[in-house]
Amino acid sequence: MPDATAALKLPFEADDILARLMRWAACESPTFDAGAVNRMMDLASRDLALLGARIDRIPGRMGLGDCVRARFPHPAGDGAPGILVMAHLDTVHPIGTLEKLPIRREGNRCYGPGILDMKGGTVLAVEAMRQIIAA
């Protein structure tokens, strides 16, 4: 049985997590701008691939941006049950919003469009996956 205190020993680096969050939030990705959403999908795909994920790009339909499916190899092999994480990385803010409302970091807090919904949660999910892989 795993040690209950092992989670406390994981090397979470707040600065690294916040740096990824700031990069992702700086990539404006309004829902109805397929090119902008695809740039965000490129960024997320790169980060996930660097963790060892197999990336499948699913073309958007009806003028919308693409989706990304990232699959990580299971230590028990193919067919073993896994973990499903779903998220969106588009925002409601139009291109140019960051000129008027820039993202910013103040200590351990970040502010701006996309920081919480939903890029922040997705960055944390990616970090959790990184920790699972490293464990």
In which residue ranges do the predicted regions lie?
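Acidic/His- and Gly-rich active-site-bordering loop/insert found
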Residues: 2-115, 133-134
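Acidic/histidine-rich catalytic neighborhood of metal-dependent amide-processing enzymes
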Residues: 118-135
